[in-house]
Amino acid sequence: MAETEEEETVSEEASGFSDLSDSELLDLEDTQESSASASKPGPSYELPGKDDKLIRSPKWKRRLDVSSPMERFHLKYLYVTDLSTQNWCEQQMVYGKEFSGFLTPEKSAILDTGASIHLARELEVHDLVSIPITSKEDAWAVKFLNILSMIPTLQSEGRIREFPVFAEVEGVLLVGVIDELHYTASGELELTELKTRGNPVLPSDAQKKKDYFQVSLYKYIFDAMVQGKVTAASLIHHTKLDPEKPLGPSVLRHAQQGGYSVKSLGDLIELVFLSLTLSDLPLIDSLKIEYVHQGTATVLGTEMVAFAEKEVRSKVQHYMTYWMGHREPQGVDVEEAWKCRMCNYADICEWKKSGGLISATLEPQVKKAK
């Protein structure tokens, strides 16, 4: 990539938000809010914003009495975008968790625009119904009702959007939202991920690799669901949901209107897993990423992604060792130090201060010398 093109894209990509699925944004914000409320704030940090303006953001005190980041950040599960952000820069992802309330107006506007484009695409497929919820069980019940309503459409080779996926991967529950599923002219089930761009240029190769990993994870989880590899017991264990909790009145009313005879979350979970098992849905055959310019809604290009299961599993295993507390977070190698130029956390980055960029480069040479 030419230097000028890299400069155009680095500002957007180095933020860590350019790969965030707008579908998962609200869920991610909810998780961050619950994490922040349970954390103990320490002294504030001033982070450099655009044009070197200081933006004050709380510095969350790291607790030393917990054994893993999952516990420190009070997380019951991870999002697919958590792992894809690790693929960009793991250290940046960690700072994003620690400074969960830090979002510049520019990035907020980018996310809002992207969400609007996603919403327009979704309304092309189906209407949206607002369902008031009163508990986390209700929130998950709505996800399950969405799955139940989409299964028949997939069985009849229709097109769906915003399909919730979840599976236990390497001992951690991984959750996401598939942007679109449809069948090609040859009858193959294809996943399409919409990526909106603030600049009218395609992303760098490094960004594309992160996007490839993200859609590959979606396929990995979806395939596990339709193959019966995901269990209700695992889901309940990780989310700490109460299967005996009665559904809220609005959720119950919506379920009954859909023809589902359920009273509790457990009834709904049982129905979802039974439907997935008996649906005979195919595995995802192809993966496609569509890049769209936010300002004009122009399609900038599409990328077909080859699914490499062995590589995906290897990356997931490595990333999960951080979440399970088996290693410290890592930053980028020196070859990708350009990512740091517009990173909001560059001035406080422990990876840079500890010489991580250099050591990551020298380590292979040391090994060869032995």
From Swiss-Prot:
GO function terms (MF aspect): 4 iron, 4 sulfur cluster binding; DNA binding; metal ion binding; single-stranded DNA 5'-3' DNA exonuclease activity
One BP term from GO: interstrand cross-link repair
Family note: Belongs to the EXO5 family.
UniProt-annotated stretches for the region Disordered: 1-52
Function: Single-stranded DNA (ssDNA) bidirectional exonuclease involved in DNA repair. Probably involved in DNA repair following ultraviolet (UV) irradiation and interstrand cross-links (ICLs) damage. Has both 5'-3' and 3'-5' exonuclease activities with a strong preference for 5'-ends. Acts as a sliding exonuclease that loads at ssDNA ends and then slides along the ssDNA prior to cutting; however the sliding and the 3'-5' exonuclease activities are abolished upon binding to the replication protein A (RPA) complex that enforces 5'-directionality activity.
Keyword set, alphabetical order: 4Fe-4S, Cytoplasm, DNA damage, DNA repair, DNA-binding, Exonuclease, Hydrolase, Iron, Iron-sulfur, Magnesium, Metal-binding, Nuclease, Nucleus
Residues binding [4Fe-4S] cluster: 89, 340, 343, 349
Cofactor: how and how many bound: Binds 1 [4Fe-4S] cluster.
Subcellular localization, as worded in the UniProt entry: Nucleus; Cytoplasm, Cytosol
InterPro entries xref list: EXOV, PDDEXK-like_dom_sf
EC number from the UniProt entry: 3.1.-.-
GO CC field: cytosol; nucleoplasm; nucleus
Cofactor needs: [4Fe-4S] cluster; Mg(2+)
Compositional bias (Acidic residues): 1-11, 21-32
Top-level EC class as recorded in UniProt: hydrolase
Name of the protein in its database record: Exonuclease V
Subunit structure, as described in the record: Monomer; monomeric form has weak exonuclease activity. Homodimer; homodimeric form is unsure but has much higher exonuclease activity, suggesting that it could homodimerize upon DNA-binding. Interacts with the replication protein A (RPA) complex.
First-listed, main subcellular location of the protein, grouped into a coarse class: nucleus
